Amino acid sequence: ERPSYTGATESWNGSAWTEVGDLNTARHENAGFGTSTSALSATGRDPSLTAVTESWNGSAWTEVNDVNTARRGAGPAGTDNTSGLIFGGYTTDRIAITESWSGTSWTEVNDMSTTRFRPAGTGSFSNALAAAGQETGGGNTATSEEWDSARPVGAWTSANAMNTGRRQLAGGGSQTAGIAF
């Protein structure tokens, strides 16, 4: 039996977790980034694919402009609720679509070189890293790609691959000092 979808949100203070204001739309497989005082949650499944985006201010979630492509299992990169990226994910198959968040709205930007579902994501809007995930056809990949918004059109380029291909990873850190697990 599958667990029910939840909007539960918990905040870490360095020693303990505290239940805080729940997401307005309960879901799973959403992409999120930020801090305990400034975060963003986008997309997911509730149980249908959703494009819903919510912004966190440290005490409550507020629904803001939706992403352009509803999906689940996208990779996230961002440091707060004012800017960030989501990339890849799953609609009716794995996708390479990347969208950037300006603090107000989402814009589709250059796609990743490869489709991937449930990649690890880390970094910021300016410099992000997508690692591993599941490719079209269902196989796990170890490939990585780096995002650089300063390139003429903001683009992904190949980076060194992980040692082991896998999916459903979490990521943390920056583009140049990240972790995937």
What are these regions (language model features)?
Residues 1-181:
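Polar, enzyme-active/binding microenvironments
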